[in-house]
Amino acid sequence: MHRLKDKRALITGGTSGIGLETARQFLGEGARVMITGQNPATAEAARKELGNDVQIVHSDASDPAAQKALAESVRQAFGGLDVLFANAGIADLRPVEGWDAAGFDRTFAINVKGPFFLIQALLPLLANPASIVLNASVNAHIGMANTSVYGASKAALLSLVRTLSGELIGRGIRVNAVSPGPISTPLYGKLGLSEADLKAVAASIQGQVPAGRFGNPSEIAKAVVFLASDESAFTVGSELLIDGGMSL
């Protein structure tokens, strides 16, 4: 199938996990794809996996100035944009008393401020019609311990889905979100835990999923393809919860 034939797409955080798998599926659906990342090693691995048809840009997801530079890269490469998947994010999990202002600000800078100012910078380039997909989380809905700041940042994204939908639909720009449950991605390996603690955390989380397992990046990417394509042309301001029943 070529549901995204000739669509120009930007995926932030596209060098690993959900972003990388989404880039793979976008390419398979006929899109022209640019991805961002910060780690040179994962960027090189992504290039080897995806081939030379994908463009990879080093970009800091937390910096508003970097979002303007990224928009300029999109303009130079594509001339405009049909699809944005704002996927870059971090999951910093701590108890309430473990937070300081710097950590709090970093989470919101990457998970909320970055996507907001990227959308702002891309507005002159977004086509009519265009699709924006934000990567939120089931943690915006459930009261899991140690996720207060992470969950709040993802809840902020869901608020943006609704408010930006109301503001941008007149320009033909649809805004929607995917909210994954626990997914087998490198994100969990970035929590700074020992191997034993990481396994314990994973087992605890898996026990809270009615489906009895972690999801796969491909299961999220398929939903993003749908929201990016014309198949979802009447889907505006919506959230797709893909969580194995965790939010029941």
Predicted regions: what is each one?
Residues P40, H58-A69, A101, E219:
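The beta1-alpha1 cofactor-binding region of Rossmann-like NAD(H)/NADP(H)-dependent oxidoreductases
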Residues R8, T15-S16, N39:
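Conserved glycine-rich cofactor-binding loop
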Residues P95-V96, D100-F108, I205:
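Substrate-binding pocket helix/loop in short-chain dehydrogenase/reductase
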Residues S137:
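Residue(s) in the substrate-gating loop at a strand-loop-helix junction
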Residues L125, R213-I242, S247:
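C-terminal substrate-recognition "lid" of short-chain dehydrogenase/reductases
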